[in-house]
Swiss-Prot record:
It is found in: Cytoplasm. One of its GO terms (cellular component) is cytoplasm. Pfam families: Methyltrans_SAM (PF10672), PUA_3 (PF17785). Specifically methylates the cytosine at position 1962 (m5C1962) of 23S rRNA. The lineage of its organism: Bacteria, Pseudomonadati, Pseudomonadota, Gammaproteobacteria, Enterobacterales. Keywords: Cytoplasm, Methyltransferase, RNA-binding, rRNA processing, S-adenosyl-L-methionine, Transferase. One of its GO terms (molecular function) is RNA binding. InterPro entries: PUA, PUA-like_sf, PUA_sf, RLMI, RlmI-like_PUA, SAM-dep_methyl-trfase, SAM-dependent_MTases_sf. It is an enzyme of class 2 (transferase). This is Ribosomal RNA large subunit methyltransferase I. Residues 2-81 form the PUA domain. It catalyses: cytidine(1962) in 23S rRNA + S-adenosyl-L-methionine = 5-methylcytidine(1962) in 23S rRNA + S-adenosyl-L-homocysteine + H(+).
Length: 396
């Protein structure tokens, strides 16, 4: 008989809506013992079967649902089906947009909670972020090796969230050859260098692909400031869009060095590109005091908020940085501003930008809205999957 997690009375509603999480406060009791990550059955207070899930005893999210089908077993065949289903959508996207790199598995939205897999050419980069994902590592890797014999697999499970699940960080080769120090990928006509072994996340921010492409329509003959530039994807796109100048700002010299290489790799005019190692908040104030102005500013900061207790402080940070950017824009300028904080709703982010405009003494028109690229889907039952949001703002 399988181990069962029994829900408290009335706490089954989210599962009936097919939301994939069970929080610790919804649990009445456990029937039987299971190891961290082991598969358990979830039942309501009357014993009615609801879902099959992975147990996370160290986490506030006590269980993550693998399936709502009572006849489905969690094994290699299960992971193979999920991977094949996800691949169908990515095949269409890759062909339509000419991509050789994309997010193959986007966690809960692809029916594999705690699992992130990015494909860069013939390298699969794996992040296992939950106890269940880690427990099922052998089955998942076996399914990947069978479906993608041409691909090497590299683990980037060096993410702090694993500690909340009671797990150590993990990084290194899983199978096949080691990735090169920098791997060139293609995106909307750009070649971009990716550091799989040491870069942010899995090596690159694939989720901003569509936003980078959209930048081109705003930048012709414009002076562009690219804040939190990382390896310069927005800068390369701006140069391909015909900008007059683009200044990329980041605190990491290594990232800026790769950004410069990306400009050179695409045979673009390096004299139009400047790379500044500095703190964005400090530099924006310095530019303001010096009377510098720009026609387009890209504001793509890291996540400011990890939990609800940090939300208020994050709102202040987002407002401050957007106010400074708006102050630096010429009349008729464009602000492309983003938040990758999942706890920051689109409506709240829009209000923050509006408040920033008020504080800057400028009128702003919202002219375009952005979200994560289509290989980062959001399943209807899990709206938390929409974490990246952004706006193009016309500053008057």
């Amino acid at each position: 008989m399988s181990v069962r997690l029994v829900l408290a009375k009335g706490r089954e509603k989210s599962l009936l809506r097919r939301h994939p999480w069970v929080f610790s406060g919804a649990v009445a009791r456990m029937e039987g013992k299971a190891a961290p990550g082991e598969t358990i059955d979830i039942v309501d207070h009357q014993g009615k079967w609801l879902a099959r899930a992975a147990l996370s005893p160290a986490s506030q999210i006590r269980a993550r649902v693998w399936t709502f089908d009572p006849n489905e077993t969690i094994d290699i065949a299960f992971f193979t089906r999920r991977l094949q289903q996800a691949q169908q959508w990515r095949d269409w996207l890759a062909k339509k947009d000419g991509l050789d790199s994309y997010r193959l598995i986007a966690g809960e939205s692809d029916g594999l909670p705690g699992v992130t897999i990015d494909r860069f050419g013939n390298f699969l980069v794996l992040q296992l972020l939950s106890a269940g994902a880690e427990y099922q590592r052998p089955a998942l890797v076996s399914a990947l090796q069978a479906l993608y014999p041409e691909c090497a697999i590299y683990d980037r499970s060096d993410v702090a969230v694993r500690k909340k699940e009671g797990m150590e960080l993990a990084q290194g080769p899983v199978s096949g050859e080691l990735p090169p120090d920098l791997l060139a990928i293609e995106e909307h006509g750009m070649k971009l260098l990716v550091d799989i072994k040491g870069g942010h996340k899995t090596g690159y921010y694939l989720d901003q692909r569509d936003s980078r492409f959209a930048t081109r329509r705003y930048v012709e003959d414009k002076r562009v400031l690219n804040c939190f530039s990382y390896t310069g994807g927005f800068a390369v796109s701006a140069l391909m869009g015909g900008c007059r100048q683009v200044i990329s700002v980041d605190t990491s010299q290594d990232a800026l060095d790769v950004a410069k290489q990306n400009v050179e790799l695409n045979k673009l005019d390096l004299s139009k590109a400047e790379f500044v190692r500095d703190d964005v908040f400090k530099l924006l104030r310095k530019y303001r005091d010096q009377g510098e102005t720009f026609d387009v500013i890209v504001m793509d900061p890291p996540k400011f908020v990890e939990n609800k207790s940090q939300l208020q402080g994050a709102c202040r940070g987002y407002k401050d940085i957007n106010m400074l950017a708006i102050q630096l824009l010429n009349p008729g300028g464009i602000l492309l501003t983003f938040s990758c904080s999942g706890l920051m709703t689109t409506d709240l982010f829009q209000k923050i930008v509006a408040d920033a405009a008020t504080d800057a003494g400028r009128d702003v028109q919202f002219i375009e809205q952005f979200r994560q690229a289509a290989d980062h889907p959001v399943i209807a039952s899990y709206p938390e999957g929409l974490y990246l949001k952004g706006f193009a703002c016309h500053v008057m």
